[in-house]
């Protein structure tokens, strides 16, 4: 069981040398929103919130977490990450209906859920993959963000960096 004391958000943007064309539009930077939860003993867990689009999506998700989810979580006690997920989903359902922002709310809950799972795993002194029931400490990875234009060069660069699998945008 954990009692949430507080949370923090941080927005990061990594400028891209070459803009990336995605199915959503052109990305000129790689945004990231991290949420860090603290329990009443000072143990923390970190999660990431999806925020690629629109361009102001990162700041918007951070604002949602700070203004909506932080007050909902503060001083709440949870038996499990699933209990917290259900609680947040239930508490924000009507807000989603009123605002039409089911996506940003769900993405924020997902990032908080990751942070909660990380926090519960840390309380048990387990790596997250083991907390989830995984059996391997390594998993295969692939390079993504390879666009049709200039794909051959981008693929060669990824292979040179050691990637053995690629995801090509078409």
Task: Label each region the model flagged.
Residues 23, 105-106, 143:
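A generic structural signal for short
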Residues 6, 38-123:
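Metal- or metallocofactor-binding catalytic centers and their adjacent structured scaffolds
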Residues 1-11, 122-138:
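N-terminal amphipathic alpha-helix/helix-capping segment at the start of soluble metabolic enzymes
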Residues 34, 118, 155:
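Short glycine-/small-residue-rich flexible loop motifs, especially phosphate/cofactor-binding loops
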Residues 130-170:
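Metal-dependent enolase-superfamily TIM-barrel catalytic cores that perform enediolate-based chemistry
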Residues 1-46, 50-54:
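Structured beta-strand/loop patches that form or line metal/cofactor-binding pockets in enzymes
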